[in-house]
């Protein structure tokens, strides 16, 4: 017991010393941290933020980054709702980008959709108070993917009532279609002259080198004509040759020498100049003598005509052949025969090279599509024809599906995987879009939409629909192949295909949305429920 009493104070003393040392060490470290925080705040802040910049990305950030980079692929595990949200965000982003690009001055050089040409892409050739003539830019000028359309151009002219486009000939074959109003077209050859009356939907071929002039005989309606031009001499370029001289162009007679003209007409040059080429002094004297306010030369290539002149020009004109067999030279109407596709949502008319001798050697087909408001032309593709489509009337939107060119990727040393791309654009009157062969397309009409199509390389072209109850190539696949091709079972695939009971044209609204709208209308009409 005595020994225990002696050791206990010693033990207490040792424990006290250890406690004091621990407290001293703690205070020293605390002061060091305080000094560090006050002396080096920047380094401390960097240490705090550095791990955050290097932290792994969340799935949401990965999806957003893929959307910014334009990647079409999804994360491996996504619900149906996430996929729908992904598509909706992508579509909204693409539409915003297209709208912003269309307002940019460098839009033509960096446009994301090289297959769409709005009405501003036309170049005006002639314009006066009576009308205008304009031509669309070359298709291969936008992208080399359309280089096979290098030798095809679109020309449009519009003229007011009671006007005439002066005679001319061109080094190009023309296939023209009337999209508004009425026209009387006269084609002149060395041995005869033939006049034709054309109405809405009528088409006519004007061979290269044929002199022609176009009259708008109507008293009220404007005339609108669209022509497909196929140049003869230089691919992609054609020229109009006028025998008359106006403020817009010179007569081709003015290109000959004085001696040649005198020998040609067996007349003095001064007389030739006064009658054919025009002389400013002589012209002014004639105007004063006749009391005219303005001569035809001052008006340009589109001039006014009197009612008496219109009666003479239309006296012997022939009309289109209607449902009769198309003639070798006369006009034909695109809607004269029964549509090849038709239901309550729209009609599709087509004239193929084997059915019309005028376009047979050109290997061109013509189509006319009527899509009613709120309807959809179901997805389909053409086997070999390239279609140039002109919006004649209405508004809508189209979606075209293509594949990124893998060969061009190799040329540009890109290592991106092959991917599907969607090219879409809103459509309005005067717009033009191209449908390459093999590219699936669908068209949605927000108002009654009328489309004129020129099919290039059209002989034996086949139109393959990807949905609908008829002419559906997906439906024709073997049952076993369907199971191997798609993730769903054969029963699910068959049920999905049969859900669309319409063919060629259908309602643009999904079935669920149609049902909800019907219920909404029924609810608005019904009585108010009691609480």
Curated annotation (Swiss-Prot):
Q: Where is the signal peptide?
A: 1-30
Spans traversing the lipid bilayer: none
Glycosites? 444
Which keywords accompany this UniProt record?
Allergen, Glycoprotein, Seed storage protein, Signal, Storage protein
- Start-end of Basic and acidic residues biased regions: 37-51, 79-99, 286-302
A Pfam family per the record: Cupin_1
InterPro entries from the entry?
Cupin_1, RmlC-like_jellyroll, RmlC_Cupin_sf, Seed_Storage-Functional
Q: Name one GO molecular function term.
A: nutrient reservoir activity
Q: Bias regions of kind Polar residues — which residues?
A: 316-337
Name the residues of the propeptide: 31-108
Q: Quick one: where's region Disordered?
A: 37-124, 283-302, 314-337, 508-531
The Cupin type-1 domain is annotated at 115-273, 332-494
Query: Sorted alphabetically, which SMART domains does this protein's record hold?
Result: Cupin_1
Other facts = The initial characterization of blad was made on a seed storage protein extract containing both conglutin beta 1 and 2.
Family membership noted in the UniProt record: Belongs to the 7S seed storage protein family.
Outline what the protein does: Seed storage protein. Accumulates during seed development and is hydrolyzed after germination to provide a carbon and nitrogen source for the developing seedling.
Q: What is this protein called?
A: Conglutin beta 1
In its UniProt entry, the species of origin is given as Lupinus albus
């Amino acid at each position: 017991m005595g020994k225990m009493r002696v050791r206990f104070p010693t033990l207490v003393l040792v424990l006290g010393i250890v406690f004091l040392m621990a407290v001293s060490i703690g205070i020293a470290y605390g002061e060091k941290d305080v000094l560090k925080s006050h002396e080096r705040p920047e380094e401390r802040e960097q240490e705090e933020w550095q791990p955050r910049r290097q932290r792994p990305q969340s799935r949401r950030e990965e999806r957003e980054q893929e959307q910014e980079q334009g990647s079409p692929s999804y994360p491996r595990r996504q619900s149906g709702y996430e996929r729908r949200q992904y598509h909706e965000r992508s579509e909204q982003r693409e539409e915003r980008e297209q709208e912003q690009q269309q307002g940019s001055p460098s839009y033509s050089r960096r446009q994301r959709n090289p297959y769409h040409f709005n009405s501003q892409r036309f170049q005006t050739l002639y314009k006066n108070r009576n009308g205008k003539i304009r031509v669309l830019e070359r298709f291969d000028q936008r992208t080399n993917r359309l280089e096979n359309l290098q030798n095809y151009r679109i020309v449009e002219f519009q003229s007011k009532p009671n006007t005439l486009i002066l005679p001319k000939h061109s080094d190009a074959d023309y296939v023209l279609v009337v999209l508004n109003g009425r026209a009387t077209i006269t084609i002149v050859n060395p041995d005869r002259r033939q006049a034709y009356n054309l109405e809405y939907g009528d088409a006519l071929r004007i061979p290269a080198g044929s002199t022609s002039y176009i009259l708008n005989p109507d008293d009220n309606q404007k005339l609108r004509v669209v022509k497909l031009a196929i140049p003869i001499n230089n691919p992609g370029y054609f020229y109009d040759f006028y025998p008359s001289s106006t403020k817009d162009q010179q007569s081709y007679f003015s290109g000959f020498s004085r001696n040649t003209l005198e020998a040609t007409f067996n007349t003095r040059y001064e007389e030739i100049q006064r009658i054919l080429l025009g002389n400013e002094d002589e012209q002014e004297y004639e105007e004063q003598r006749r009391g005219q306010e303005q001569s035809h030369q001052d008006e340009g290539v589109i001039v006014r005509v009197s009612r008496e002149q219109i009666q003479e020009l239309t006296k012997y004109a022939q009309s289109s052949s209607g449902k009769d067999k198309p003639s070798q030279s006369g006009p034909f109407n695109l809607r004269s025969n029964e549509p090849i596709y038709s239901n309550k949502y729209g009609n599709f008319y087509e004239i193929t090279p084997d059915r019309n001798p005028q376009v047979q050697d050109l290997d061109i087909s013509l189509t006319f599509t009527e899509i009613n408001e709120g309807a959809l032309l179901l997805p389909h593709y053409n086997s070999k024809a390239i279609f140039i489509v002109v919006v004649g009337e209405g508004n809508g939107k189209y979606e075209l599906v293509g594949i990124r060119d893998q060969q061009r990727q190799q040329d540009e040393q890109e290592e991106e995987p092959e991917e599907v791309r969607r090219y879409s654009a809103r459509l309005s009157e005067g717009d033009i879009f191209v449908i390459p062969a093999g590219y699936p397309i669908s068209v949605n009409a927000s108002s009654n939409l009328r489309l004129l199509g020129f099919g290039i390389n059209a002989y034996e072209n086949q139109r393959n629909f990807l949905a609908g109850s008829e002419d559906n190539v997906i439906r024709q696949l073997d049952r076993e192949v369907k199971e191997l091709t798609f993730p769903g079972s054969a029963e699910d695939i068959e049920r999905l295909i049969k859900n669309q009971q319409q063919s060629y044209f259908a309602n643009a609204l999904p079935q669920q949305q149609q049902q909800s709208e019907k219920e909404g209308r029924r609810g608005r009409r019904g009585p108010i429920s009691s609480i």
